[in-house]
Amino acid sequence: MKDLLKFLKAQTKTEEFDSIKIGLASPDMIRSWSFGEVKKPETINYRTFKPERDGLFCARIFGPVKDYECLCGKYKRLKHRGVICEKCGVEVTQTKVRRERMGHIELASPTAHIWFLKSLPSRIGLLLDMTLRDIERVLYFESYVVIEPGMTNLERSQMLSEEQYLDALEEWGDEFDAKMGAEAILALLRAIDLEGEVRTMREELDQTNSETKRKKTTKRLKLMEAFLQSGNKPEWMIMTVLPVLPPDLRPLVPLDGGRFATSDLNDLYRRVINRNNRLKRLLDLAAPDIIVRNEKRMLQESVDALLDNGRRGRAITGSNKRPLKSLADMIKGKQGRFRQNLLGKRVDYSGRSVITVGPTLRLHQCGLPKKMALELFKPFIYGKLESRGLATTIKAAKKMVEREEAVVWDILDEVIREHPVLLNRAPTLHRLGIQAFEPTLIEGKAIQLHPLVCAAYNADFDGDQMAVHVPLTLEAQLEARALMMSTNNILSPASGEPIIVPSQDVVLGLYYMTRARINAKGEGMVLSGPKEAEKVYRAGLADLHARVKVRITEYLRQEDGSLRAHTEMKNTTVGRAILSLILPKGMEYALIDEPKVLTAAEQADLDANPQNWIKSVSNKALGKKLISRLLNTCYRKQGLKDTVIFADQLMYTGFHYAALSGASVGIDDMVIPDAKKDIIAAAEAEVAEIQDQFLSGLVTAGERYNKVIDIWASANERVSKAMMENLSKERNVNSLGEEEEQASFNSIFMMADSGARGSAAQIRQLAGMRGLMAKPDGSIIETPIVANFREGLNVLQYFISTHGARKGLADTALKTANSGYLTRRLVDVAQDMVITEDDCGTTEGLWMTPLIEGGDVVEPLRERVLGRVVADDVIKPGTEDEVLVARNTLLDEQLCDLLERNSVDRVKVRSAITCETDFGNCAHCYGRDLARGHLVNKGEAVGVIAAQSIGEPGTQLTMRTFHIGGAASRAAAESSIQVKNTGSIKLQNAKFVHNSDDKLVITSRSTELTIMDEMGRTKESHKLPYGSVLEVKDGQAVNAGETVANWDPHTHPIITEVAGRLHFEHMIDGVTITRQTDELTGLSSIVVLDVNERPSAGKEMRPTVKLVDLNGKDVMIPGTDVAAQYFLPGKAIVNLEDGANVGVGDAVARIPQESGGTKDITGGLPRVADLFEARQPKEPAILAEISGTISFGKETKGKRRLVITPTDGGDVYEEMIPKWRNLNVFEGEKVEKGEVLADGPESAHDILRLRGISPVANYIANEVQDVYRLQGVKINDKHIEVIVRQMLRKCEILSAGDTDLIEGEQVEVARVKIANRKLVAEGKTPATFRHILMGITKASLSTESFISAASFQETTRVLTEAAVGGKRDELRGLKENVIVGRLIPAGTGFAYHHGRINQRAAAARAVGVPQVTADEAQQNLADLLNAAGSFDEE
């Protein structure tokens, strides 16, 4: 019998499926699921609590209420399994079948399924080519629709009102057929001939020219084809049978006092059954039409409410005035089935408690309270007690544990040993929010946490709580130990920098012990080694900071990896020598004590007086940055184990010496500079002066405000500078009797200087002045707070302060929610991005160059290419073919050094965006796994890691939109370029002419001036505006600080390209121009009138300046046959007279430029969200659609017609541009495709369309990085690239070729590529397409997997679309697999999935049998059960 049961269990296994298909259910299908028809609205008998027969909880239909017991009690026990009771008709089986057996309701009149009717675009409407309004009028019995026109002049699906219908009846009798209600729609849907329609529509598409018609036809065509391919029939969108959910999924629970708690679904079903039964009765009675009609409409409404309450009309409410929860509400939203139960499950074996510091723990340990451990590990303890024979049964073991006998604790110790537990702190923003530790038992009730992992958890000990989870199975323990142990997560997956970095006390302790103090006790000693230094210090003979000579033995790593000892005397301090004791072998001493770089004079002094060696001791102490670098170097050189031990040792040492340092903060530590009074008095005087100027009308209110704020901002700077100088330096006499300067030992200064806590800005508020405050709207209050916290604030100052503080709190709350939502969208778009193969073999890639803004290198090349794979051989600069790095090599630290030594400044690297893998990404295109430091493994979920890396720092980004102005970002209008580096000038995309002084005048808009060093590396780059005058030539050498270019920032010149005499055309005084004379200088100038200021005679005229030679003939622009003529736009100013002579490079006219004004720059989180959502900016830059020559056509009201004539003689391109846009181009100028014509924020869509994939990737990556860099957050570019790849997943079909795609359709690129490969192999025409950029929300919703999309947002819409198209979900991504309850196809599950797929394929090949379908399995099971029943009888 047991074997049979096992066999049965094996039979019902349905895990073996490869994909899930969703479709429309036909009435027959619904009947086949059902175990009987629900005929009555009754639920259960309120006295006996037994379900009513034929009701919503009927036991005959849905199964027994108690295990193996029929309702009337005739058959009980297991032996009657499978018997159907003659009396009550209930099958004797397990009660859990009530969770899976469905019923059905036969509807007396067909009803439309609201999802296919109302979910836009209405599927029924599309198929019938009727508007939703019309269909609703038919469905809700307001008008008739013609179904069969017969021999009349009516059309099929024509609407008829009541009167029209009666007239038609009189005229034609029963020649035609017209109905109302769902029956009519059902008949229309049945009559559709899909194949015929598809044929006619494809022909229509080929013939039509109108865009709107094309779009509409394409939509219909896609829908029809979906129906054809999926095997759905259109009439199934109208329901004639309604399925009934199994009763245990809509429970009814008796409460005490004779009341019941029930699921809303029961109410909705009751309503449907009541109306349906009433309708049946009315139809039997042949009631009047109007009554039947009303009943049918009510039935339709109740079915609507059951499926999706509130979708149409007012939602049906329950007794508590709340809308009832319908079937659709059950699955959608945060509380729906997908997000609440399938994606987020609660787990057993977990506990939570407050955390405290565990300064004595090792990095892989955590302290677990005994009580907690005992509870969590109970099953293991029971097992151990039994196997040891200490307890005979589980029950006895349980008693022992409850009594907490002594032996139980010993066993708990054994059980816990080497059994890791997971610690998690909410919110888990990235994968380091859950890590594994080995528990050690502690007294008390709080969990102890190692201080170094706090950064990863973002935890502090002010009452944070953490949860503990126990991995149960051996595999889970193994994964926890090998992958999640805190010692295996030293590097951050976001940037590849160490995340196990000491902070606060530890940093302060290490900083304190590595400081040097002048004339400390024991200065000038000579010691035999670090051990002796420690002895001397412990004995109190020398101070920790004393400058001494110590014999240090370093172990240096050789080329072959072996260690070589090297001993020498070092001038250092006692503390640094002691610290060197914990330095791992193989790391040089210079890492903790950088030798001081001596000037020539100091070196000479030292040679002359050797006793002055004290002065050569470096005065640099270990700060936070240096410690981080120390750990990073250790990881790269020494590997994981040494780093972990070293980090722990650093922590213990740091805590120890921080305690000994006795650093504390007293009020006297906040030293207020003496100069403060004078500085503030001077600022007040300046402000008073400006106020006077304002009152006498010399400056405007706006200028006054800005100047006042400038004055106070600079005063604040001066005060804080004075204060820091005062705080940070002190002078002392050394042992040689000379005075030396040293860094101060002021506690506050040490904390800030070491990076332990606080910053210069905070010290400024304590001891300088608080400075300017902002109002909640972001504008700056012009009276600053001149007091600091040491002096104390008065009431007014305190009140001003609260403004900013309150805004900060409100911002933070909003920010957290926004940031979480951004992370959720990112995870959703990238969740199926997994490394699926080793190398896709592509030669494509992105060009990487150092990021340079003005004169500063923001990000050097090495940081951008470290950990990437080279796409092409890197050639040594200056040679033709000497290969430095071969293609497909992973660039590690050594290779990056090699590139730097050879001054390479562009490298083509492989990128996720250019990867050719169909699904997922390949390891070579991704490069290094940042958290592990080697090439990424197959199965790594790089998409989720990317999303977490971008989302996790989201809460640190600001929410503000920055106003330019105030002290936020004051940049005076630039008017010249001063170079910061020495090097040679190089001009890029320059067009220029030489003027009369033989200086270059720039005549193009995209000119860049770069400074190259002698190795040919770019040091800085500047944009040169049109009309700037260069002081230098291309290729000339310049020195740092030289001014190389000048221009007038307030006007925009028009530059001549040839010499000649001026000739004015259409320049008529009072019509197109007006003359103005400057009162001060007496010079007159001509100002061109704007079109709308001219009289009607001058509207069409175009004022022009022509250049003519002495004979009055037009002068041509060299190398072209275009006459040199310059059209003058409105407001242009001409300072020359008609007939004046001009040279090359002179300005014939100037156009005044309004200064930028206060445009808001969107910053922070909103900016990142805008970029990833690929939103169109408000006024985007206008880019040239084709390459060619610019000219202007006829103007219209408010718009200019811009014409580009292509150089290769193709079609002319025209665009209407609003007049107020500042154009960057003039008539006759040549532009390249994708060049900026009118300034503004560039739109990512335009960049992709006109410049291609690589530029759009660079644009998004750089813009996102700008936001993060401002906050000092480091994120690797490749994470952003992974997201961009997902945004570029879709393409638009341009021509279909021999595929069955439709032009203009949006399809996954991978699909098209696969189809094209097949076509090319068969020698047919492939489809052509162009990439499109989708925002992350849209991309998530349009993924191939409908399960993933439905669990993200807009569940109804996604499921409706998927059902109509009969979509199949291949379960490729992570989300789908979590939802169906499988291992995810990433990480350790990657191999499992591949094995499974291969196994199934092999099995199918071996047997050659088709897979068993679900129905067959069901049948087999039924046969077996019946057979089982017959065994028992014997």
From Swiss-Prot:
GO terms for molecular function: DNA binding; DNA-directed RNA polymerase activity; magnesium ion binding; zinc ion binding. Its cofactor is Mg(2+); Zn(2+). GO terms for cellular component: DNA-directed RNA polymerase complex. It comes from Aeromonas hydrophila subsp. hydrophila (strain ATCC 7966 / DSM 30187 / BCRC 13018 / CCUG 14551 / JCM 1027 / KCTC 2358 / NCIMB 9240 / NCTC 8049). The keyword Transferase applies. DNA-dependent RNA polymerase catalyzes the transcription of DNA into RNA using the four ribonucleoside triphosphates as substrates. GO terms for biological process: DNA-templated transcription. Belongs to the RNA polymerase beta' chain family. It comes from the Bacteria. InterPro entries: DNA-dir_RpoC_beta_prime, DNA-dir_RpoC_beta_prime_bact, RNA_pol_asu, RNA_pol_N, RNA_pol_Rpb1_1, RNA_pol_Rpb1_3, RNA_pol_Rpb1_3_sf, RNA_pol_Rpb1_4. Zn(2+) 1 binds at residues 70, 72, 85, 88. Binds 1 Mg(2+) ion per subunit. Binds 2 Zn(2+) ions per subunit. The keyword RNA-binding does not apply. Keywords: DNA-directed RNA polymerase, Magnesium, Metal-binding, Nucleotidyltransferase, Transcription, Transferase, Zinc. Mg(2+) binds at residues 460, 462, 464. The RNAP catalytic core consists of 2 alpha, 1 beta, 1 beta' and 1 omega subunit. When a sigma factor is associated with the core the holoenzyme is formed, which can initiate transcription. Its EC number is 2.7.7.6. It catalyses: RNA(n) + a ribonucleoside 5'-triphosphate = RNA(n+1) + diphosphate. Zn(2+) 2 binds at residues 840, 915, 922, 925. This is DNA-directed RNA polymerase subunit beta'.
